[in-house]
Swiss-Prot record:
This is Ferrochelatase. It catalyses: heme b + 2 H(+) = protoporphyrin IX + Fe(2+). It comes from Synechococcus sp. (strain JA-3-3Ab) (Cyanobacteria bacterium Yellowstone A-Prime). HAMAP family: Ferrochelatase. It comes from the Bacteria. Pfam families: Ferrochelatase. GO terms for molecular function: ferrochelatase activity; metal ion binding. The gene is hemH. Pathway: Porphyrin-containing compound metabolism; protoheme biosynthesis; protoheme from protoporphyrin-IX: step 1/1. NCBIfam families: hemH. Its main location: cytoplasm. Belongs to the ferrochelatase family.
Length: 341
């Protein structure tokens, strides 16, 4: 007898100050995130960089309450998704797994196996595909399935990217309009879409579709917003000295201030949950940067979290794969599309 389940994937985040260094180690030990010319150096590099960055990172997490809310918010998203699936006639469990912190993918997959799941729909909570996010998690799942004959009997249906999902686009557009209307002069607001950056070489050399999907996503959302405001796309959270996708958010904000922008709305376009990049990097660092640049009114669009319209979009993504007659899918080599298995 078949038994379906849904697995939500996310990055993970440290929940206490003690978690910060081991979380960073897991992050930098992933060769899909940080690519070194000599793979045997990966673990040593991860230990060194996590040790060096931990003090500053702890201060950043302390500024937002001591730890990341990502696990709690993702659990709320899973509960909301399960409730909407049940209402639609699909009584299936929804699991949450994180790539770099607990609950780790490896342990959650064992729970899925113990629960007797025979068909698993895998939904990364990254709207746009990247080698470094969805791709990394899918590679880990591929390895786990290859190593365990019992897992190999579980049919996996993986959703690569969903930046163009209609309800997601509508939910983002609605949130933007609500924040625009809160400004003193809504028509005079400049809208800055700030996406998480990736190394430029991922796009130019490895064929990562992230930038293309991000630009298409912004166009879809802006069309749905239906306002004449000027808008810009930039990239944040750069690590290291290599060239990442540009323009950088920390460069764009002072440039906008120098051009006379006095009202700025930041849209965290690649984040569907509040975490360190929204609560600390945007709300604290970029807000201060904006004020220094002469921007007198600064707002941010909240992450969608468990917004019912957004969750309805996740239901629409998952539901076709719960049907017994639907074909199973696996990600293409690069991503962004689906191949029938």
């Amino acid at each position: 007898m078949s038994k379906s389940g849904v697995l939500l994937l996310n990055l993970g985040g440290p929940e206490t100050q003690a978690d910060v260094q081991p979380f960073l180690y897991n992050l930098f030990a992933d060769p899909e995130l940080i690519r070194l010319p000599f793979p045997f150096l990966q673990r040593a590099f991860a230990w060194a960089i996590s040790t060096l960055r931990a003090p500053k990172s702890r201060r950043n997490y302390a500024a937002i309450g001591g730890g990341s809310p990502l696990r709690r918010i993702t659990a709320a998203q899973a509960q909301a998704l399960q409730a909407q699936l049940v209402a639609a006639g699909y009584d299936v469990p929804v699991y949450v797994a994180m790539r770099y912190w607990h609950p780790l993918i490896e342990s959650v997959v064992q729970q899925i196996k113990s629960d007797g799941i025979t068909r698993l729909v895998v939904l990364p909570l990254y709207p746009q595909y990247s080698i470094s996010t969805t791709g990394s998690s899918f590679k880990l799942l591929d390895r786990l399935w290859a190593e365990d004959p019992e897992l190999a009997r579980i049919e996996r249906r993986q959703i690569c990217s969903w930046y163009d999902q209609p309800q997601y686009v509508q939910a983002m557009a609605r949130a933007i309009r609500e924040q625009l209307d809160a400004f003193e002069d809504p028509a005079g607001v400049h809208v800055l879409f700030s996406a998480h950056g990736i190394p430029e070489s991922y796009v130019t050399q490895a064929g990562d579709p992230y930038q293309q999907e991000m630009e298409a996503c912004v166009q879809l959302i802006w069309r749905e917003v239906g306002r004449p405001n000027r808008h810009t796309l930039s990239y944040q959270s750069r690590v290291g000295s290599v060239r990442w996708l540009q323009p950088y958010t920390e460069t764009v904000i002072p440039e906008l201030g120098a051009c006379g922008v006095r009202q700025l709305l930041v849209v965290p376009i690649s984040f569907v949950s509040e975490h360190i990049e929204t609560l600390q990097e945007i709300d604290i660092e970029y807000r201060e940067l904006a004020h220094q640049a002469g921007i007198r009114e600064f707002r941010r669009v909240p992450a969608l979290n468990a917004d019912p319209l957004f969750i309805a979009g996740l239901v629409a993504l998952v539901r076709p794969h719960l049907l017994t007659s639907a074909p199973a899918f696996v990600p293409a080599a690069v991503g962004g599309s689906l191949l029938e298995r």
